[in-house]
Curated annotation (Swiss-Prot):
Transmembrane segments: none
Principal EC category: hydrolase
Source organism of this protein record: Pseudomonas putida
Cited Pfam families: Abhydrolase_1 (PF00561)
Residues flagged as site, Transition state stabilizer: S113
Residue numbers marked as site, Catalytic role in ketonization of the dienol substrate (substrate destabilization): R191
Subunit structure, as described in the record: Homodimer.
Catalytic activity reported: (2Z,4E)-2-hydroxy-6-oxonona-2,4-dienedioate + H2O = (2Z)-2-hydroxypenta-2,4-dienoate + succinate + H(+); (2Z,4E,7E)-2-hydroxy-6-oxonona-2,4,7-trienedioate + H2O = (2Z)-2-hydroxypenta-2,4-dienoate + fumarate + H(+)
GO biological process: 3-phenylpropionate catabolic process
InterPro entries xrefs: AB_hydrolase_1, AB_hydrolase_fold, Epox_hydrolase-like, MhpC_alpha/beta_hydrolase
Protein name: 2-hydroxy-6-oxononadienedioate/2-hydroxy-6-oxononatrienedioate hydrolase 2
EC number(s) recorded for this UniProt protein: 3.7.1.14
Amino acid sequence: MTIDISEASSSRFARIREGELDLQLHYNDLGEGAETVVMLHGSGPGASGWANFSRNLEPLLAAGYRVVLMDCPGWSKSDPIVCRSSRSDLNATALKGLLDMLGLERVHILGNSMGAHSAVAFALANPRRVGKLVLMGGGTGGASPFVPMPTEGIKLLNGLYREPTIDNLKKMMNVFVYDASDLTEELFQTRLDNMLSRHEHLDNFVESLAANPRQFPDFGSRLAEIQAPTLIVWGRNDRFVPMDAGLRLLAGIPNSSLHVFNNCGHWAQWEHAEPFNRLVLDFLQH
């Protein structure tokens, strides 16, 4: 069965008023399944739900899930914002507002990098609203005892926010994945166009870092509170968030398992899309 999937036809906007937040969020809404999977993207310049997860949608939809991709505040077509406190909690608050607006009481959450940090923040604040968690390349802040911080990848990411050029984008993306030969000029140009189309997002991220360099707090002391079944996925060659962070999540979350992809960087769901999709479907269905 061929499933019609397009960004334009699934594009939606919602006004979110939750706590101190009052902003317009963009999201994509696909499928009509009884169970919903929410996908949260990472913090790279030009990121969006669609750009992060376009290789992972069809298997979930074919399996009967509804899929919601949220563009976090300050990214893509969502409203700009300066975050002076916890970005993880800000995104979790925005997600709660979106789920309330959509009438979704309980969802599975799949988060990549910043999206994983935000998924953990949401699960801690709203434990009864989480079915299962999938955390890729993130889930808690905190320093690595093995890798100098900030990591090589994060330095390049922050540099790209300050100087959004095609050369700086290529430098970051070449570290983002294990095999840079998979990156195309079309991908680079699409990402650059998305970055430059909302320059205020770039400026606001730099201002946010200046106001609070620790945008993503260390949830280590609270991980044991998470009761949701959790699948942790990491790339062994991740140069943005080192793999020991995944081991900390595994040790802290009681009902969790860890899958490590070899020859894989920070973008497991894109670099190893087919085995990743099988892994996630098996986890969600059993």
